[in-house]
Amino acid sequence: MELNNIKPADGAKKDKRRVGRGIGSGLGKTAGRGHKGQKSRAGGFHKVGFEGGQMPMHRRLPKRGFVSLTKGDTARVRLSDLAGVGVAEIDLLVLKQAGVVSGAAKAAKVYLAGELGKAIKLSGVAVTKGARAAIEAAGGSVAE
């Protein structure tokens, strides 16, 4: 076998049907388009979703939900990220300056992930129950 001898197996490829080439072909005259109507004519088709003038499905169904404008405003902070800040008293501004949260964040919440090796004082930042217990166990405090 060589590259110039390779060919598909017998019956693997069907010949394309040539439409509109006489009644003997089985697809002559109307060429499989039926008689009359918009779809039988050249260039005659409708836009996607068009239902012949009846109210289309995408307009019959009610709208649902909304896009929250405040969804991305609260940043999530790992407990282990607080240890790398290098400041004893931490608030939202300190977290932004340290690059722990983005500058666009309007609030932050600390959750229990990782270890906290030193005492810190947290203020103006939300805290989960587990993270609060870990901060207080390390000798730190949380002020609302």
From Swiss-Prot:
Q: Which family does it belong to?
A: Belongs to the universal ribosomal protein uL15 family.
The family database entries (NCBIfam families) matched by this protein are listed as: rplO_bact (TIGR01071)
- Residue ranges with Gly residues bias: 21-31
* Superkingdom of origin organism: Bacteria
Pfam families, A to Z: Ribosomal_L27A
Protein keywords:
Ribonucleoprotein, Ribosomal protein, RNA-binding, rRNA-binding
Q: What is this protein called?
A: Large ribosomal subunit protein uL15
Q: Name one GO biological process term.
A: translation
Q: Which GO terms describe its molecular function?
A: rRNA binding; structural constituent of ribosome
| Provenance organism | Thiobacillus denitrificans (strain ATCC 25259 / T1)
The entry describes its oligomerization and partners as: Part of the 50S ribosomal subunit.
Known function: Binds to the 23S rRNA.
Show the segment(s) annotated as Disordered: 1-57
Under the heading InterPro entries, the entry gives: Ribosomal_uL15 (IPR030878), Ribosomal_uL15/eL18 (IPR021131), Ribosomal_uL15/eL18_sf (IPR036227), Ribosomal_uL15_bac-type (IPR005749)
What does UniProt give as GO cellular component?
A: cytosolic large ribosomal subunit
